[in-house]
């Protein structure tokens, strides 16, 4: 054992590099959820002795992690009071019919909101709003949703509180220099990059983004091609199904079929249907492919009626799938959902939510068969049919997002001014350095609970636990890199290789390397790896470390070229009906513009030479 400990001590840098490579591979291949991978990395570091047990679990009590937890809760408290909806209603009327004017207006609404609230929360609020906006103004939603995501990303860089990456970077900076970033230290650079990015979006989006998905007529049946796989079958006199309940018949388990409704003597019976006894003459509205319909006809003696006649687009509904009791709606799987990685069959989705999935949209792909065997992913868009009260229940979950506007009577509008005052006090007190943001943010949480803006039980559901576990696992990796000398080794190599370059060139290279890395890793993982290296390179070359840390922080968050580089990109991937290449088409030029502009702006605002 002593020999093993000695060997491990002698090879700390190679071992740390091996763990980094392992983490990179696991993040890219996604064999495990990234938050699980991060915790696994922390465990490996402790087992190898690269961090002590205390250091290995320190991520859970790190000031950045604690602050981010509080900011999730404060963001949720703000959204529960309907403030964003109030701002939306007061400004949306100025949108007009010009697409560029609408993009500019959306940027002005979303950007400042993202500066203080969680980005994913902003997109979750605005997704159904933008869809309805597109429908009313006869615009393809594909022209608006990537700009929505980009605007939240850019707006999140205006203040320290805008993203978890900013707060994590501040925690790393405090560890390296003894002082973290102040709340508004990002603001001069953030406002400029936001302005540059918004101008690009307004000019380029109408040209570069295709009209992939048009929901202007509201005809869900036509968009999802429901007519091709929703049919009516009737139970004839000699069918073996007569006298059995739907559960006993096992037709939904044995065949790729979902029964959406049973019609008995002209009376429509919605879900739940499992214990409904089937009788002669019953008509079943089913989701099924032709092959399965023919199989059930042969084996169970049913008859297939003529294709379901869906109503015209002018009626703005899905025909027989919708009624006064039932409806059809799209539901988005969010990043913290327990559904991710599971199949509908494993989840017993129909029984759990009292609704049936009749199609899945994944980007441009439309999945309509063998739905029970499809492993669900973050960003999948489910087309659900079920009782209207089931959707009211779905609107309260934090794992799924129903893409329709929530009624204002579900919000605590009377607490809006109180919530604004609480968040303003949190920002002012922390901004004046009276108390650390980790303290003021939790004081704000308690104030929201005491004032009734939040209920105590809502605190736990408001926290994005996947992000918290990701941070808790990544922070020990940064510690291991420092303890083992890996950060210093990287910095020495880069300083020797780039010592002859100008300050602008070095900043540009760090921005580019970080921006490319964040497209395949999470932005938090990228900042943990790159920020300490950038800091030590700056110190080695006698340059301003703050400039290098800001370049890395901004580059880590500005992920525009893929739907997987940033969570808000993934959230709009399905609803926009995008292809993977759509993000590269509009995101690559924006990345180039910011790669050239951000280092220059950093030099002008903060200087590349140390200020002493």
UniProtKB/Swiss-Prot annotation:
UniProt subcellular location: Cell membrane
PROSITE patterns: NA_SULFATE (PS01271), RCK_C (PS51202)
Pfam families: CitMHS (PF03600), TrkA_C (PF02080)
Molecular function via GO: monoatomic cation transmembrane transporter activity
Cellular component terms per the entry's GO annotation: plasma membrane
InterPro entries, per database record: Cit_transptr-like_dom, DASS-Related_Transporters, Na/sul_symport_CS, RCK_C, RCK_C_sf
The entry's keywords: Cell membrane, Membrane, Repeat, Transmembrane, Transmembrane helix, Transport
TM stretches of this protein: 13-33, 38-58, 67-87, 107-127, 144-164, 189-209, 419-439, 459-479, 501-521, 525-545, 546-566, 586-606
Domain called RCK C-terminal: residue spans: 218-302, 316-403
Membrane topology type: Multi-pass membrane protein
GO biological process: one example: potassium ion transport
Organism domain of life: Bacteria
Family to which this protein belongs: Belongs to the SLC13A/DASS transporter (TC 2.A.47) family. NADC subfamily.
Name by which UniProt lists this protein: Uncharacterized transporter sll0640
Organism expressing this protein natively: Synechocystis sp. (strain ATCC 27184 / PCC 6803 / Kazusa)
Origin organism lineage: Bacteria, Bacillati, Cyanobacteriota, Cyanophyceae, Synechococcales
